């Protein structure tokens, strides 16, 4: 298996409900190491830049409004097959369809307030990590 990095956001709805520790425990229980982490409060410009690929979609403004509504936790996760493993751990975007025991089935309130974000490919992981972290902020844990 390949050791890879992926990017994760714990969204404002989950931060507000004090779920950071519970979600971090899920990462570690799944064999994913947290190699970078920080709390940030996105402004509109930063959120719009991060979600630029969705700019033409009807939900874009609501997404930006939500992501700027409170602090978020951004982190880099590392492990074997980290991107796929984290996607499975998150569950589907719609928590009503998420498998039992996934982060979204257990913590998400709705499709809009779905608690977490995760990269969907190696390319998006690299782009998203670089958007929030410098190389010096990532601390490999061998």
Swiss-Prot record:
Top EC class for this record: transferase
Positions that bind ATP: 11, 59, 87, 93, 104, 114
Gene3D superfamilies found in the cross-reference section: Nucleoside diphosphate kinase-like domain
UniProtKB keywords: ATP-binding, Cytoplasm, Kinase, Magnesium, Metal-binding, Nucleotide metabolism, Nucleotide-binding, Phosphoprotein, Transferase
Cofactor: Mg(2+)
Gene Ontology annotations of biological process type: CTP biosynthetic process; GTP biosynthetic process; UTP biosynthetic process
Known EC number: 2.7.4.6
Positions annotated as active site in the UniProt record: 117
Family matches, as Pfam families: NDK
Family indicated by similarity: Belongs to the NDK family.
Subunit (UniProt): Homotetramer.
General function of this protein: Major role in the synthesis of nucleoside triphosphates other than ATP. The ATP gamma phosphate is transferred to the NDP beta phosphate via a ping-pong mechanism, using a phosphorylated active-site intermediate.
Protein name (Swiss-Prot/TrEMBL): Nucleoside diphosphate kinase
Upper classification of the organism: Bacteria, Pseudomonadati, Pseudomonadota, Gammaproteobacteria, Vibrionales
């Amino acid at each position: 298996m390949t050791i890879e990095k992926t990017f994760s956001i714990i969204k404002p709805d989950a931060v507000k409900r004090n779920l950071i520790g519970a979600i971090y425990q899920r990462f570690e229980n799944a064999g994913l190491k947290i190699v970078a982490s920080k709390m940030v409060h996105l402004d509109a410009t930063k959120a719009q830049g991060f979600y630029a690929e969705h700019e033409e979609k009807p939900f874009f403004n609501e997404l930006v409004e939500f992501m700027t509504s409170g602090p978020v936790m951004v982190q880099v996760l590392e492990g074997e097959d980290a991107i796929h493993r984290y996607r499975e751990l998150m569950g589907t975007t719609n928590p009503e369809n998420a498998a039992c025991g996934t982060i979204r089935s257990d913590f998400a309130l709705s499709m809009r307030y779905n608690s977490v974000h995760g990269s969907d490919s190696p390319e998006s992981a690299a782009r998203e990590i670089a958007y929030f972290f410098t190389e010096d902020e990532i601390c490999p844990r061998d």
